[in-house]
Amino acid sequence: MFFQDIIQNLNKFWSEEGCLIMQPYDTEKGAGTMNPHTFLRAIGPEPWSVAYAEPCRRPTDGRFGDNPNRAQHYFQYQVIIKPSPDRIQEKYLSSLEFLGINPKEHDIRFVEDNWESPTLGAWGVGWEVWLDGMEVTQFTYFQQCGGVDCNPIPIEITYGLERIATFLQDKESIWDLDWNKDFNYSDIWLQFEKNQCEFNFRASNPENMRKLFSIYQEEAVSLLDKKLTFPALDFVLKCSHCFNLLDARGVISVTDRAQYIEKIRKLAREVASSWIIERESLKFPLLKK
């Protein structure tokens, strides 16, 4: 199955399960959880069901395209359903079957692995899903996002698209994956990966990144004062990416790391609180759906 067909098939499967099919969010982020369709919609009483593919950037994970299974830019497929439905594990297994993976013919294990994002003030309980010895999915019941308790509890299912594709296509390297019948993964992403790694590890200006972090932090605070939740979240995500770039350059001390994380977490919590206040002022309109 081609890489693009995996996404299309997951879209079809989860659409038929009642999920909105959304598009990626247009700001750098380290995980699909940072998309407002997850980070904001996971909190508050309103129901929500959404699925989307999300490109993610983790600068420190880059290896200039030399590692067969590791890259600073990759794709997740994110599913959020609130409240979590009954028999969600069975639905997940059905989604694998929809991709051509028969659970009866493979060793599929749910391995306990609770999840936490310190910068987002988010955590949950759940499992890694292992397929014939390879982790392919994270399965999490969110407990908090932005320091706000989740009630009702949503389920987050995060598929590692490259890992699933290497399994389906029997490839040893993500760079050899067939995107479609004419192009492989490296045709599209290898030059991008090399360029971005050069920037992440060598070419970025740490002093400018520090300045940008301060500017983005100041802008986020200003936007929160104006009760503009979505733009504020954009600048929190920019702060997070600046922090990750500084981390990739190796210029953050242990003390600095803790301080940067606390600054981002504080902003994320304020964004989450702002979201709840804003939705409450609208009388939580999705409760009427």
Curated annotation (Swiss-Prot):
An example Gene Ontology biological process: glycyl-tRNA aminoacylation
Catalysed reaction equations from the record: tRNA(Gly) + glycine + ATP = glycyl-tRNA(Gly) + AMP + diphosphate
Disulphides: none
Compartments, as annotated in UniProt: Cytoplasm
Chief location: cytoplasm
InterPro entries assigned: aa-tRNA-synth_II/BPL/LPL, Gly-tRNA-synth_heterodimer, Gly-tRNA_ligase_asu
Keyword Protein biosynthesis appears in the UniProt entry: yes
Swiss-Prot/TrEMBL keywords: Aminoacyl-tRNA synthetase, ATP-binding, Cytoplasm, Ligase, Nucleotide-binding, Protein biosynthesis
The UniProt record lists the keyword Hydrolase: no
EC code(s) of this entry: 6.1.1.14
GO molecular function, one term: ATP binding
PROSITE patterns named in the record: AA_TRNA_LIGASE_II_GLYAB
Family: Belongs to the class-II aminoacyl-tRNA synthetase family.
Assembly information from the UniProt record: Tetramer of two alpha and two beta subunits.
UniProt-recorded name of the protein: Glycine--tRNA ligase alpha subunit
Organism: Prochlorococcus marinus (strain MIT 9515)
